[in-house]
Amino acid sequence: MQPNSHIFVIITISSLIITVSAYGSTGTIAAAFGENGFFCAIDASGKQEVICWDRGNTNRSLNRPPGEISGYSPPMTSLSGGEGFLCAITSNTSRAFCWNLEDPSENLVPRAFQYNSYLQIASGNNHVCAISGLYYSGPDYGPVHCWEYSDNTNFTSGLLWNSSFHNPYIDSLMFRKIVSGDGFSCGVTKDGDLVCWGPKSNLLNFSNNEEFEVLASGRNSVCGVSKDSGQLHCFGDETEFGSLPNRPRFIALSAGANHYCGIREDDHGVECWGRNLNSSSSSSAPNTSGFVAISSSDSTTCGVRELDLVLDCWRVHDSSKADYSPPLELCSPGMCSPRGNCGDGWFAFNASILKESELTSLCSFHNLNICLRCGISCLEGYFPSSTCNPNADRVCTPCSLCQNSSCYGICKIRATKSKEHEQKEQREVRRLVIIIGCSVLGFLVMLIGLSFIPKMTKGSKRDDEERSKMTCCFCFDKNSVEADPDPVPHQSVLLPTAVSLGETKIFRLSELKDATHGFKEFNELGRGSFGFVYKAVLSDGIHVAVKRANAATIIHSNNRGFESELEILCKIRHNNIVNLLGYCSEMGERLLVYEYMPHGTLHDHLHGDLSQLDWSMRLKIMLQAARGLDYLHNEVDPPIIHRDVKTSNILLDGEMCARIADFGLVSSNERDSSNSDREGDVYDFGIVLLEILSGRKAIDRESDPAGIAEWAVPLIRKGKAAAIIDRNICLPRNVEPLLKLAELAELAVRENSNERPNIRNILCFLDLIVKSGLTF
């Protein structure tokens, strides 16, 4: 019999599987709503400790109490957020534990329920419901218990456990899953019925009998995904969910104040919708990694990335900075369960991918599994290089590494790759024909030449002695090379095109014109204060970079100054410097020939379209760039002050080694170095360090503040260096070296130049960090 004094709704559905992660739902990451809102997540250390962070970006572990927290809370297996508070199921005893940030160690669960065991919990606006049972064993269903708080600002002032949520009919049911909102809870019974109860449950206005496989609740609404059609349905207050997206099915949902977000089944990307949300707002979710878990507060959504289990947060209603800056911690991808076999379309998370030798499971009980949904495809710019299996999800690989036809279509490069492959085969055939032809011709010439040797031995040697030799007058310490036998008067000495490191050559103007196709724009690599830089291929096939001075540079400098600078540049040789190979000064031109750097600039890898750099590569680049700058400051005589150290002047060679570029040809006044000049280079190098650590541009007009130093330094000085670390790439297990590097960058960009370290000290510190290595 159903008491009339209680309102509830029943929707009959069969064999329901629900994944929830939202307001009033259960997951490994959850958010408390309201002015006193905060996020918490379960870490991936295997201890199931809880880490929380609030709007002030104060990060704390509830299990490792800092000085401002008295006592501590137990490890937990699942979390659920309410209005200003969170509740959880403890991992060791399967009991309920609720808290707020005023005193996280105080359990707000009424004493009558504190010693009961629960397998799931769902926090609402000011009430909590939990399913009796053990999450780690036994049946996955049980009766539901509810309690209510009369005052959210003082939870202990009124506990109405025998309240409007107490219902004899509800007490008689066995539930598998539950969610809660403002004045209502909904649960899936053992028989597959969806039942909603509470004083406001009638406002949900359910209008169909869909079978939902995913369900989430907001304050005054519920959204679900149909198991059969994959279609999204929402009920209740339309201002919370707005227009629904027409997308492939979602495998998880999360609800905020006026928005919902979902993880797509196919590529595990996140999409958001709701009131006043457009396509650009929806796309504010990170697109460099899929997600395994998400949760929302009023206007912010946070999630656990599938790439590296790192937390990421973003604002949904606008593109400004997120309210919450999560700590650099790896978090659990899902809830622990006693399922031995995860089933079709699922895989069991393997803790070995975290590469911690002693870590075998993320669950307190090692017989438990974390079952996650398989991905089918990958985000744009990636292709699946392996498919999902019972022990691992599919692997997504950048399209830049696509090497065969299996990924051409996905990466949209089939036609290009096929054409390149055909052209490569044609070049190989032509090369083979040329080699065979030249070999035969050479053999014939040798036979003919041998027949004339006796007649040539009587020739005069004076012919050779009369051939004059001219050498380069600028590069005194370099090898001399034979010049053209018929030089043009009043022009520079012309050298052969063979180029080798250690020799600085003089090139013909015509030769460099041919090598650059007449200095055409399509061969242009870049532009600078000195002039233009062109990619060139010499007649012997060697790739070089040719820097051509513009008219202003030529007018404002004299020949003697040019020669003096050449004399210095000719002596510079270092593995982390873009070395000068030669020059040309014919017809008033000033052309410098440098080593060609095929992998472009550091700037383009950090901020452009070139491939992303992992942390090992970034640290190596920091160290190598510091070595190059140290060489200029301390080993060259006279010392060279760069005056323009920036990511676009750090180039990467064929082996991805960093080279300092664009440091020569300054005026004689500029060449006079001083300590203040060196400290200026150190400041610029500090900016480079901040760019590498954060992935942010030195000047970003779309951010406030625009300058990277103005943005990063206050955070570092407040002990929040983790907030600047780039989360778009897989983080190392131990981020402490990165935080130390942030502190080093802060020293380098100090306003008082006397407080900055010199480049030699920076180099020593970087060397120690790189030698210690990073653990991934």
From Swiss-Prot:
Task: Topology check: give the Cytoplasmic ranges.
Answer: 454-776
**EC number(s) given by UniProt:** 2.7.11.1
List all topological domains (Extracellular): 23-432
Binding of ATP occurs at L525, G526, R527, G528, S529, F530, G531, F532, V533, K547
Q: Source organism's superkingdom?
A: Eukaryota
**What InterPro entries does the database record attribute to this sequence?**
Kinase-like_dom_sf (IPR011009), Prot_kinase_dom (IPR000719), Protein_kinase_ATP_BS (IPR017441), RCC1/BLIP-II (IPR009091), Ser-Thr/Tyr_kinase_cat_dom (IPR001245), Ser/Thr_kinase_AS (IPR008271)
Identify the glycosylated residues.
Answer: N59, N92, N154, N162, N205, N278, N287, N350, N404
Membrane topology, from the record:
Single-pass type I membrane protein
Matching SUPFAM superfamilies: Protein kinase-like (PK-like), RCC1/BLIP-II
Record's catalysed reaction(s): L-seryl-[protein] + ATP = O-phospho-L-seryl-[protein] + ADP + H(+); L-threonyl-[protein] + ATP = O-phospho-L-threonyl-[protein] + ADP + H(+)
Q: Where in the cell is it found?
A: Membrane
The job of this chain, per UniProt, is described as: Serine/threonine-protein kinase with low activity.
What protein does this entry describe? Serine/threonine-protein kinase-like protein CCR2
Query: In which organism is this protein found?
Result: Arabidopsis thaliana
Gene encoding the protein: CCR2
